[in-house]
Structures are given as structure tokens and as C-alpha cells.
């Protein structure tokens, strides 16, 4: 369960970073 949550968090983090880079 913890591993699954960590993977989801990492995926969300990458998506957020991609959006921020797109705005910049």
C-alpha cells in the first residue's frame, strides 16, 4: 500500500513539474 502511494505521489509530482515548466 505504501509503495503504491509513493508511486502515485511521484507520478503526480512529475505532472506538476511538467505543468510548471510549461507555464515558464
UniProtKB/Swiss-Prot annotation:
> Which organs or tissues contain this protein?
Expressed by the venom gland.
**The keyword Secreted appears for this protein:** yes
GO BP of this protein: defense response to bacterium; innate immune response
Q: Matching InterPro entries, A to Z?
A: Antimicrobial_9
Positions of post-translational Leucine amide modification: 24
Mind naming one GO cellular-component term on file for this protein?
Answer: extracellular region
Q: Secreted: present as a keyword of the record?
A: yes
Q: Where in the cell is it found?
A: Secreted
What are the boundaries of the signal sequence?
none
Q: Which Pfam families match?
A: Antimicrobial_9
The UniProt keywords, alphabetically, are: Amidation, Antibiotic, Antimicrobial, Secreted
Q: What does this protein do?
A: Has a broad spectrum of activity against both Gram-positive and Gram-negative bacteria. Is inactive against yeast, erythrocytes, and insects.
- Provide the family line: Belongs to the ponericin-L family.
UniProt-recorded name of the protein: U1-poneritoxin-Ng2a
The record lists the organism as Neoponera goeldii
